[in-house]
């Protein structure tokens, strides 16, 4: 303050006024000395008063600033020690040099000085030393503390966010969740019942669902004979997930006692606040659950993540063919509106994919449109390769086969693209065709997965069907003009059915035999089917070696794996899994081996007690309840086996690891 006061620039105005006043007083002496004397005395008095006033003001201001500085310092010290923010200073060895009282109270200590961070909290020490961020929530003695670290200054701030985190937790667990419950086969089960039996079945299902809703605190409202709306929250949803949605089993078991097994599909929307968006998510989840065959729960979050529960039973075969007739008519109209049709299956097509594609090509030709099969002859399994060799003998049919590069050149905005035996964009032969095509049709028999082709104009997915070839055969039957198949075309479709049903032993319904009967009547050669499916001696020996390495645990889970340096094709891996399933005591089989494309392939089979589709989905794959597969990249066979065992353990949730 004194330096400020003594600065000359500060005193210049006073000097100037004093000099001016003295000059005026001296001037008066020239005219009249008495007036000059009085003026000089007056100027002296005023000058004295001004200097005295300035010095007094300076002292008062200095005292005020001194008092203010003391109070600010005192408040700062009190704030550092008393405010509800923890402050901590570290030395170069990560020992505490200083901390305020709030932080000491958090650790329930009198003083923290001299202690190391590791003594107080290992997570805190790890965060300060190796943390990738400058802030983190850490729990200390029951409190949630937000820690902000300034590493260069070795300074840490601690904010108590316990109440905030509790409010956030309550908000999250009380957030609204919407569910749509659908009775999968209610209409089919009750259509043959009299009024009394139908009323009893209706009352049974309603009472089971109402009891379940009351137990969990769910609001349940029936909106139609086969549909309910349920309102719950995230906390209740967590409880339902822990129970693995036992209501699915309860409804199935209770109705089975009345010789009419009804199954549920539940679509749940969660993770958003908007009610219209919740409703959209719930309906989308229900469509997903139904597309996977029903008898399961699909939970879709706002971020797009989907979880599945249930799916313990095979989809029930639909007794009505109305849908097949409607789809056949719609497909005919789409073909008629297109300039040409491209037909594409999945990568490394098997007999079902290739047979279904040949069947669709026949549908296209029967509607007088140009059609092409998109296939890479060098990338097919052994059976499909033999079928392609047979196709080469028929010039007209072989001329319809084109490579993916040719398809990219042929496609126009009016071209219809039909995808068979898959619905996943990542699995099609040429993914770029999906982005070039404006009109896409999907025909598949696999349970619908989270990944799906975007915006198809027609979807025909029936998980109850044995194969895509079965679905295509029915579409052929309902074409308005009677279609006459050649021997090879009928044989290709029949071979697709035989492969996917394991010679009519798995997933075979009455409509499967109807389709096979139709194809046989069209001239399908069963001997040629066997020739197409023949296995080489070398493959037989490889399969036997894989089976020899199989280990079967006490739960009936069989796992076989190849050596790290052995490469087997996917067909051989699948055949080995099929063979393992025929062994006594085996309820599910898994075969792991390196593939030719560098990935590790896993084929899974079951008799129905274990849902291998769900297990494979945990590894990024998919399929059916009894037949599924997955491909893992950048892993060894041993690492793939470990991931598989973890997925099996997660599936059983609490069961002993296999």
Swiss-Prot record:
Q: What EC numbers are recorded for this enzyme?
A: 3.1.4.59
Residue span, GGDEF domain: 174-302
* Statement: the UniProt record of this protein carries the keyword Transport: no
Region described as DHH: 340-497
Question: Which positions, given as ranges, span the membrane?
Answer: 12-32, 33-53
Q: Which UniProt keywords apply?
A: Cell membrane, Heme, Hydrolase, Iron, Manganese, Membrane, Metal-binding, Transmembrane, Transmembrane helix
Q: Name one Pfam family in it.
A: DHH
Name the principal localization, coarsely classed: membrane
What the entry lists under PANTHER family is as follows:
BIFUNCTIONAL OLIGORIBONUCLEASE AND PAP PHOSPHATASE NRNA, CYCLIC-DI-AMP PHOSPHODIESTERASE GDPP
Name the protein family. Answer: Belongs to the GdpP/PdeA phosphodiesterase family.
Q: What is this protein called?
A: Cyclic-di-AMP phosphodiesterase GdpP
Q: From which organism does this entry originate? A: Geobacillus thermodenitrificans (strain NG80-2)
Upper lineage is: Bacteria, Bacillati, Bacillota, Bacilli, Bacillales
């Amino acid at each position: 303050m004194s330096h400020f006061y003594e600065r000359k620039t500060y005193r210049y105005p006073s000097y100037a006024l004093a000099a001016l006043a003295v000059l005026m007083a001296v001037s008066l002496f020239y005219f009249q000395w008495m007036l000059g004397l009085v003026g000089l005395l007056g100027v002296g008095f005023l000058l004295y008063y001004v200097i005295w006033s300035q010095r007094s003001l300076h002292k008062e201001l200095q005292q005020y600033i001194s008092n203010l500085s003391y109070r600010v310092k005192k408040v700062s010290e009190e704030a550092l020690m008393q405010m509800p923010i923890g402050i901590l200073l570290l030395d170069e060895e990560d020992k505490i040099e200083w901390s305020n009282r709030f932080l000491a109270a958090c650790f329930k200590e009198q003083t923290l000085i001299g202690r190391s961070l590791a003594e107080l909290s290992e997570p805190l020490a790890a965060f300060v030393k190796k943390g990738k961020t400058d802030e983190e929530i850490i729990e200390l003695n029951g409190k949630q503390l937000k820690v902000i670290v300034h590493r260069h200054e070795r300074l840490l701030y601690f904010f108590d966010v316990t109440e905030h985190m509790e409010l956030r937790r309550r908000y999250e667990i009380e957030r609204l969740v919407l569910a749509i419950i659908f009775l999968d086969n209610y209409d089919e089960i009750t259509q043959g019942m009299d009024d009394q039996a139908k009323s009893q079945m209706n009352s049974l299902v309603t009472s089971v669902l109402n009891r379940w809703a009351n137990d969990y605190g769910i609001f349940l409202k029936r909106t139609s004979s086969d549909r309910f709306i349920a309102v719950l929250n995230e906390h209740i949803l967590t409880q339902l997930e822990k129970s693995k949605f036992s209501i699915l089993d309860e409804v199935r078991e209770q109705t089975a006692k009345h010789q009419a097994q009804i199954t549920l599909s539940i679509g749940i929307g969660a993770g958003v606040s908007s009610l219209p968006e919740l409703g959209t998510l719930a309906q989308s989840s229900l469509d997903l659950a139904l597309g996977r065959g029903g008898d399961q729960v699909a939970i879709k979050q706002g971020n797009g993540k989907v979880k599945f529960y249930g799916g313990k039973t095979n989809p029930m075969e639909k007794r009505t063919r109305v849908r097949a007739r409607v789809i056949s008519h719609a497909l005919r109209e789409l073909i008629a509106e297109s300039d040409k049709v491209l037909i594409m299956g999945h990568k490394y097509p098997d007999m079902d994919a290739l047979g279904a594609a040949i069947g669709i090509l026949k549908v296209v030709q029967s509607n007088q449109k140009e059609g092409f099969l998109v296939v890479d002859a060098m990338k097919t399994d052994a059976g499909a390769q033999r079928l392609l060799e047979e196709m080469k003998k028929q010039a007209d049919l072989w001329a319809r086969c084109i490579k993916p590069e040719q398809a990219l050149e042929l496609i126009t905005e009016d071209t219809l693209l039909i995808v068979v035996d898959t619905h996943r964009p990542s699995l099609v032969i040429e993914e770029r065709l999906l982005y070039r095509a404006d009109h896409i049709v999907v025909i598949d028999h696999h349970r619908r997965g989270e990944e799906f082709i975007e915006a198809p104009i027609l979807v025909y997915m029936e998980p109850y069907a044995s194969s895509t070839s079965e679905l295509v055969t029915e579409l052929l039957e309902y074409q308005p003009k009677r279609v006459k198949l050649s021997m090879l075309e009928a044989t290709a479709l029949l071979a697709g059915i035989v492969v996917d049903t394991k010679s009519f032993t798995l997933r075979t319904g009455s409509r499967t035999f109807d389709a096979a009967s139709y194809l046989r009547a069209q001239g399908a050669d069963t001997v040629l089917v066997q020739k197409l499916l023949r296995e080489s001696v070398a493959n037989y020996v490889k399969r036997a070696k894989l089976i020899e390495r199989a280990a079967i645990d006490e739960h009936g889970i069989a796992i076989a794996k190849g050596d790290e340096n052995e490469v087997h094709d996917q067909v051989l891996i699948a055949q080995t899994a099929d063979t393992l399933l025929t062994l006594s005591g085996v309820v599910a089989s898994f075969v792991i081996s390196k593939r030719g494309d560098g990935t590790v392939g896993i084929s899974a089979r079951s008799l129905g007690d274990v849902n291998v589709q769900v297990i494979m989905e945990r590894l990024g794959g998919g399929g059916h309840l009894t037949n599924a597969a997955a491909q893992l990249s950048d892993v060894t066979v041993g690492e793939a086996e470990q991931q598989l065992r973890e997925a099996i353990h997660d599936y059983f949730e609490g069961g002993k690891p296999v």
